[in-house]
């Protein structure tokens, strides 16, 4: 595969790990999978990711930034998403999505977006649920193990890694602004700007019990 017509170089894509999936796959995501590695990890087709990313940015560019809501609850996506909002003007919800944000007019941060952009349909399930309820289009990054029912547009990618999510948000921001005629070939921000935000993310470690062993905390999925 050559770099020609790709949104960034193939080396950049591969170095970010956007193609590295999980050891699970669904029928929904099967068409985006290139191969399975000897260790059982499914590998996404970079060319298809590039194509879908380009189309997603073009679709989103039909909307004013204030009419788009981009959501993530993934730790490594929070910083890059905030940078995404800063560069594009798109509304972002980084962290917990408060129930009723889209469905309860009395909610403190009630919003009426025309399109939803998710980082993960499973982790961002509350936002997904409410977007379905009010009937707006839903664009989402999806990894190999995701179910895609109710999603209107899928961007197949590793949506868990710092480098991969940073690259996704950078490229979508760049293409969104280009498509809207706001920037030209000279881009006033870089992939590194987004990656820097991801690298600053801190993950809370499990608390130690009296014997010095991590306490297990079970969460509903």
From Swiss-Prot:
Annotated GO biological process: translation
Keyword Nucleotide-binding: no
Keywords (A to Z) from UniProt: Ribonucleoprotein, Ribosomal protein
GO cellular component terms given for this protein: small ribosomal subunit
Pfam family, one: Ribosomal_S2
Single GO MF descriptor: structural constituent of ribosome
Region annotation Disordered: where it falls in the sequence: 202-221
InterPro entries in the record: Ribosomal_uS2, Ribosomal_uS2_arc, Ribosomal_uS2_CS, Ribosomal_uS2_euk/arc, Ribosomal_uS2_flav_dom_sf
Claim: Zinc-finger is one of the keywords in the record: no
Family: Belongs to the universal ribosomal protein uS2 family.
Entry protein name: Small ribosomal subunit protein uS2
Species the sequence originates in: Methanococcus vannielii (strain ATCC 35089 / DSM 1224 / JCM 13029 / OCM 148 / SB)
Gene from which the chain derives: rps2
């Amino acid at each position: 595969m050559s770099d020609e017509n790709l949104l960034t170089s193939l080396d950049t894509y591969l170095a970010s790990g956007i193609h590295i999936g999980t050891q699970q796959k669904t029928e929904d995501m099967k068409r985006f999978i290139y191969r399975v590695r000897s260790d059982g990890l499914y590998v996404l087709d970079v060319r298809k990711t590039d194509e879908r990313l380009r189309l997603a940015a073009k679709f989103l560019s039909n909307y004013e930034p204030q009419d788009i809501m981009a959501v993530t609850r993934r730790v490594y996506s929070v910083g890059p998403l905030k940078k995404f909002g800063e560069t594009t003007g798109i509304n972002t919800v980084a962290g917990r999505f408060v129930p009723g944000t889209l469905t309860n007019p009395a909610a403190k941060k009630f919003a009426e977006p025309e399109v939803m952009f998710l980082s993960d349909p499973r982790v961002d399930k509350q936002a997904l649920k409410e977007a379905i309820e009010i009937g707006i289009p839903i664009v989402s990054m999806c990894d190999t193990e995701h179910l895609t029912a109710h999603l209107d547009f899928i961007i197949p990618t590793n949506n868990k890694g710092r480098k991969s999510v940073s690259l996704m948000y950078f490229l979508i921001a760049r293409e969104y602004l280009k498509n809207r005629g706001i920037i030209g070939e000279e881009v006033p921000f870089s992939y590194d700007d987004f990656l820097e935000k991801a690298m600053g993310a801190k993950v809370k470690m499990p608390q130690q019990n009296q014997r010095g062993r991590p306490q297990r905390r079970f969460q509903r999925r």
